[in-house]
Amino acid sequence: MSILPDIKKIADETAPNLIKSIKIEDIRHWKEINKDNPISQHLDFEEFDHEMTGVSIIAFHYNLDYPILPDGCMSISPYYYFANKYYKHYNPLLQELAVTGRIKILKDTHLKSLANLSGIGFYGKNSIIHNELFGSRFIMIALGIYEEIEWDGLNLVMTDCGSCQLCIDACPTQALNKPYKLDRNQCLRHYMLTGIEVPEIYKSLMTDRLVGCDLCQKVCLKNSKKSQIDRMPDYDQEVFGINRYMEEGGLTLNDLMPPLAEWVGKNYARANRVKEQCNIIYNNIRKGGEQ
């Protein structure tokens, strides 16, 4: 019996989704004849082994709408809330399935390249994958498959953006000055995630954001459809109140990380990174910031 129904069941229990499956043989052949293609250059086969027959890519839909932010609080992109929520559900189930040897959870393979090749979606000029069903509001994972299943053909169309450049114009730091390519050194989200020193000119542009930006996604016409699911919950002021992270005495910063991790996941609730971003947010809130 095919493994796909088991994968589909887990996906359906997690969130509205789209699944595409492509043969490794097809991927290898495409890469061989498209060596100069940027997508080809991102793809490597380090996680693929000789027994693996193909890859299934799952796109889980999420709601990009933000709740109202209470005064004195910092915000997060809904992406991180839903990514953490979905991971908690699907990961233990997929781990059980992986023990059977029928799938492998891929962790380092370039998801955007696989998503485009599989037909999950097209590249936007903001370098994010989108489709007609979910826009760019989805979270992706990839699974290596170890049996023959019903495969999808390769998608050979990179983008459907045409002359639109709304996302490029919306970026406050011009990080999208080259279509389809993100300049990480000018991306607000990149600094939020890494915790490296933020250039002074970018600090006020971060306003109240702890993690995530989404400005380029909010203007994308592909995201104009109403989401199929409810937005993330209202902000918990006990978790997102900025003063809690700035006060000395009482709870330490490490004490505050577990409640925050319930919202954004442990990877993004790291004390050193959060502290750096909180300092910026605190100053922006105090000064009024720049919208």
Question: Whereabouts are the PLM-identified features?
Answer:
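Short, Lys/Arg-enriched N-terminal segments with co-localized hydrophobic residues
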Residues: 288-289
